[in-house]
């Protein structure tokens, strides 16, 4: 089920992307980080996603009079897994070349947890918090937000 294009949401996406990019750019003036609120961009993405998913569900309920959990989750998988697999396959050769063997073991585990949409738990319980200084050695650390989003949709589609 295709939702109508909403150009105003692109403006919100732009704000979200820029806040995350500026945060990760670590731009400083006289030693002071000028943008400390990158997390706001992630929050904006969560809100946009919740809004769009709710719109899709309501539209399906209005048109068909019912809602299929199976179809909902099939659409989520078809939308997310191909891009996630592409990123993983693209990253593998670089990780093989640049990561130390001990780091590569954690990298391999992070792939499995990312595919299971539970990387937020993996990174948290393995002491690899998002925002940690060694984040550059964790190519899939960013998948914590995807995991949180998908866990939310398991509980509250």
Segments from the language model and where they lie:
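Membrane-interface helix/loop caps of multi-pass membrane proteins
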Residues: 1-157
């Amino acid at each position: 089920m295709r939702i109508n294009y909403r150009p105003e949401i692109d403006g919100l996406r732009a704000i979200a992307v820029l806040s995350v990019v500026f945060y990760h750019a670590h731009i400083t003036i006289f030693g002071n980080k000028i943008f400390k609120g990158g997390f706001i961009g992630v929050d904006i993405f969560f809100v946009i996603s919740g809004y769009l998913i709710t719109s899709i569900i309501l539209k399906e309920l209005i048109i068909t009079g019912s809602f299929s959990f199976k179809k909902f989750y099939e659409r989520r998988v078809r939308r997310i897994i191909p891009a996630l697999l592409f990123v993983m396959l693209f990253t593998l050769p670089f990780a093989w070349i640049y990561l130390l063997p001990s780091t590569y073991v954690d990298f391999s585990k992070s792939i499995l947890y990312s595919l299971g949409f539970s990387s937020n738990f993996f990174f948290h319980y393995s002491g690899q918090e998002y925002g940690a200084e060694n984040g550059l050695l964790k190519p899939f650390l960013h998948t914590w937000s995807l995991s949180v989003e998908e866990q939310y949709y398991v509980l509250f589609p």
